């Protein structure tokens, strides 16, 4: 076996890409060769670290988003005594608040990350989330302001931070990822959403068990007053407050993550810094340390010679005035929008749906059993459906491909919602629960994962974060439509003492229509597996012959590199 060559400044563990290509003067060629090394790098601990840093933040996002159905249930008990539930308008407003803030964060942080850099924004959005989460847990009403209004305010602010995390986590992961496993890495980050949902269900279960004695005293939610109401008040504050813990753990690592080499190459045009940042990432350092004089000269040359267009408003509109690029953005944005209409319409109403199908209330003798059944029901949905769906995507997305998974997911979800909607009155509660669990599985082994992954791959570096943010924002606009306009229709025609959700079957039928529309928009997106980000975005267009030539060039340059490096060091 031949001994692998080591370039100056490298070792067996950490290869020095900077010295590999130090002798190459053309900044475009250095960029291509250095990024090829990133794309071809074997999967290592530095990739695991990138996924973990992005994933812990996404875990926090998911926990905070999906505790809302539990939050509104408990707020209804505490602040609406005698009724046991809050008005539908208040329930909807709290759920919409996070989505409204998320739209702002996705567009704002997405654009800012393209202007100021990924590193500059990463961590700032997490500060929003941590602060707003703690503020919610400590919130209290007063004679002059209602607790519902206070919660809505803080959830909007929290949503801004959550929104910023979508484009940043996706883009940073994709730009650091090896081409072969980029889908799995991005899918693993997104799969933390399932673990966040699972954690929310477990925390709810534990606090319910902890206050069992106080909760058992009230036979119904409406009669939960006194010690029972105090217990529920402590419960919702605990459930919300715990969401700040993983964010605090992830904050340091986000603030110290290096800038992505692609951004430094293509937007900053800082060739020397980007080359050193690649090495810094692999060694766990926050930033590369190139020679400052060499860096300044190289940057000046790159400004003149780089083939990649400079980012500007004019270039942005020129780029998306081309039909191909506009249709691509429409494909990612509309697919996400149609998905979230149904996904958030049902997922943020898990507690309501469990109640509708009788799972949480049937046979329940007191408030404790209702809340316990709700927590266990959420655990069943997440463990049996959501979590497996996420991880099946992680293990198949780089072999099956993004587009087939999205087609399959939308298609099967259309069928499941048609069955739930049109056969709603003929299905038993257990059958409805089983179909609902299947729907959660195919949301996540389907478009919920792929709509996050694809926008992080197909757009050029200079507009990648903005475009991902716009796509994600359309998704959250869809969730606002699903929660604000469609989900409340379930109460249409309700009479006091009767079925509180007589229109639930028609709501599910409407969701089926949007899943069918998602099948159509999937035709607008390309297959992205095993292709470099530059191939997908058209930043350089390689045929098979050109790619083979590039591989030959890469080998030749790396063979020459030790000699050149030695000359530099001499």
Swiss-Prot record:
Q: What is this protein called?
A: Repressible high-affinity phosphate permease
GO MF terms, alphabetically ordered: phosphate transmembrane transporter activity; symporter activity
Specify residue ranges for compositional bias: Acidic residues.
537-546
Its annotated function is as follows: High-affinity transporter for external inorganic phosphate. Acts probably as a H(+)-phosphate symporter.
- One Pfam family of this protein, by short name? Sugar_tr
The residues on the Extracellular side of the membrane are 83-95, 142-143, 208-237, 347-374, 425-433, 490-505
- Chief subcellular location: membrane
Specify residue ranges for compositional bias: Basic and acidic residues.
Answer: 547-560
What the entry lists under CDD domains is as follows:
MFS_PhT
- Chain intervals with Polar residues compositional bias: 561-570
Which residue ranges does the record annotate as region Disordered?
537-570
Source species: Neurospora crassa (strain ATCC 24698 / 74-OR23-1A / CBS 708.71 / DSM 1257 / FGSC 987)
């Amino acid at each position: 076996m031949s001994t692998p060559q080591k370039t100056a400044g490298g070792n067996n563990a950490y290869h020095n890409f900077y010295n590999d290509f130090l002798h190459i003067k053309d900044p475009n060629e250095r960029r291509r060769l250095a990024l090829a090394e990133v794309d071809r790098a074997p999967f290592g601990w530095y990739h695991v670290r990138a996924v973990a840093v992005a994933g812990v933040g996404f875990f926090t996002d998911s926990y905070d988003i999906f505790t809302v159905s539990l939050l509104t249930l408990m707020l209804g008990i505490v602040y609406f005594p005698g009724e046991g539930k809050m008005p539908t308008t208040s329930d909807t407003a709290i759920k919409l608040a996070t989505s409204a803030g998320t739209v702002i964060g996705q567009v704002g942080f997405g654009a800012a990350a393209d202007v100021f850099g990924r590193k500059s924004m990463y961590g700032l959005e997490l500060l929003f989330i941590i602060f707003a989460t703690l503020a919610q847990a400590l919130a209290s009403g007063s004679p002059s302001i209602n607790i519902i209004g206070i919660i809505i305010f803080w959830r909007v602010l929290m949503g801004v931070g959550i929104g910023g995390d979508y484009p940043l986590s996706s883009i940073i992961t994709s730009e650091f990822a090896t081409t072969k496993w980029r889908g799995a890495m991005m899918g693993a980050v997104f799969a933390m959403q399932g673990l966040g949902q699972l954690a929310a269900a477990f925390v709810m279960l534990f606090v319910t068990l902890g206050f069992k004695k106080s909760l058992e005293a009230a036979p119904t939610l409406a009669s939960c007053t006194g010690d029972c109401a105090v217990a529920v008040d402590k419960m919702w504050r605990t459930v919300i407050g715990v969401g700040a813990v993983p964010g605090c753990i992830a904050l340091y690592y986000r603030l110290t993550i290096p800038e992505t080499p692609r951004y430094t190459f293509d937007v900053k045009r800082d060739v020397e810094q980007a080359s050193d940042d690649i090495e810094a990432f692999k060694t766990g350092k926050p930033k590369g340390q190139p020679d400052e004089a060499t860096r300044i000269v190289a940057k000046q040359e790159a400004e003149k010679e780089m083939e990649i267009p400079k980012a500007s408003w004019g270039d942005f509109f020129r780029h998306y005035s081309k039909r191909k690029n506009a249709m691509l953005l429409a494909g990612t944005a509309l697919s996400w929008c149609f998905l979230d209409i149904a996904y958030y319409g049902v997922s943020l109403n898990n507690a309501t749906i469990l109640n509708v199908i009788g799972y949480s209330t049937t046979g329940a003798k007191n408030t404790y059993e209702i809340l316990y059944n709700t927590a266990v029901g959420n655990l069943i949905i997440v463990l049996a459906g959501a979590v497996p769906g996420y991880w099946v995507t992680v293990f198949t997305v780089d072999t099956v491909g993004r587009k087939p998974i999205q087609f399959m997911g939308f298609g099967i979800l259309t069928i499941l919602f048609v069955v739930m909607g049109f056969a709603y009155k003929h299905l038993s509660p257990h059958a409805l629960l089983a179909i609902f669990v299947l729907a959660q599985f195919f949301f996540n082994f389907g478009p919920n994962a792929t709509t996050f992954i694809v926008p992080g791959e197909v757009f050029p570096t200079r507009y990648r974060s903005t475009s991902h943010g716009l796509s994600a924002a359309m998704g959250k606009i869809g969730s606002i439509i699903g929660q604000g306009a469609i989900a409340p229709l379930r109460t249409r025609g309700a009479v006091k003492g009767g079925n509180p959700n007589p229109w639930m079957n028609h709501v599910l039928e409407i969701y089926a229509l949007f899943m069918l529309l998602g099948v159509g928009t999937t035709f607008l997106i390309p297959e992205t597996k095993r292709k470099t980000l530059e191939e997908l975005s058209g930043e350089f267009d390689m045929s098979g012959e050109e790619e083979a030539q590039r591989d030959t060039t890469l080998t030749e340059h790396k063979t020459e590199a030790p000699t050149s490096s030695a000359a530099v060091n001499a």
